[in-house]
Design a protein with these regions (language model features):
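Short conserved segment of the HATPase_c
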Residues: 109-121
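A conserved beta-strand-to-alpha-helix junction within the catalytic ATP-binding
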Residues: 24-39
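Conserved catalytic submotifs in the C-terminal HATPase_c
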Residues: 26-27, 46, 51-61
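Conserved glycine-rich
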Residues: 147-148
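Short alpha-helical Gxxx[C/S/T] motif in the catalytic ATP-binding
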Residues: 135, 139
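Short beta-strand/loop element within the Bergerat-fold HATPase_c
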Residues: 88-99
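Short helix-loop "hinge" at the ATP-lid/N-box region of the Bergerat-fold HATPase_c
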Residues: 81-82
Length: 166
C-alpha cells in the first residue's frame, strides 16, 4: 500500500545518504540490467496501455557497482515513466556506449516543474497519479554513488527523457 511504499522509500534514501562508498561491488552488464527491468515492468506497462521498447545500441557495456542498487535505479526510472505517461504512450529505453536513456512520447513536463524534477518530495502541480516524489531522487543518489549522473529533460520532438550517463 501507499504508506508502506513511502516508508520503504524513506528508509532506502536514508541508507543511501549514509553511504560514502559502495561495498561488495562487482561487474554489472548494463544491457542485462535493462532487459531484466523491462521484463519486470512489462505487465504493469501493458496494463497502463504503454509499450516498452528496448534498444541495445551497445550491448557489452559493463559498470562496476552494486547490482541491486543499479537495478533499483533502472526500476525507479521505468516505474516513473509507466506511472506518469499517458495511455497509449511508447517508451524507448536506449543503451549507448556512455549512457542509457528512458524516454516517453507524452506531452513532456512544464518547464518550471522540470527544473525541480528529482528533488526530494517534489511532485509537479496537478499530478493525479499516486507517488511520493522520492523515486527519481533515489535514482539520482544511486547514480552518484556509482560515478554516474542523471539529467531530466523534455525531448526536442516531445516527451520526457531521463538520461543516465558516465
Amino acid at each position: 500500500d501507499r504508506a508502506t511504499r513511502l516508508v520503504d522509500q524513506l528508509l532506502t534514501l536514508s541508507r543511501l545518504d549514509s553511504l560514502a562508498q559502495l561495498d561488495d561491488v562487482q561487474q554489472v552488464a548494463i544491457a542485462d540490467l535493462l532487459q531484466s527491468a523491462v521484463m519486470e515492468m512489462y505487465h504493469p506497462a501493458q496494463q497502463s496501455g504503454i509499450e516498452l521498447r528496448l534498444h541495445l545500441n551497445a550491448s557489452h557495456i559493463v559498470r562496476t557497482g552494486q547490482p541491486l542498487l543499479l537495478s533499483l535505479l533502472v526500476r525507479n526510472l521505468l516505474d516513473n515513466v509507466v506511472r506518469y505517461s499517458p495511455c497509449c504512450s511508447q517508451v524507448d529505453i536506449t543503451l549507448n556506449a556512455r549512457e542509457f536513456r528512458v524516454r516517453d512520447n507524452g506531452p513532456g513536463i512544464n518547464p518550471q516543474a522540470l527544473s525541480r524534477i528529482g528533488e526530494r518530495f517534489y511532485r509537479p502541480p496537478g499530478q493525479e497519479a499516486p507517488g511520493s516524489g522520492l523515486g527519481l531522487s533515489i535514482g539520482r543518489r544511486i547514480a552518484s554513488l556509482h560515478g554516474m549522473q542523471v539529467d531530466f529533460a523534455n525531448a526536442r520532438d516531445g516527451g520526457f527523457e531521463a538520461r543516465v550517463y558516465w
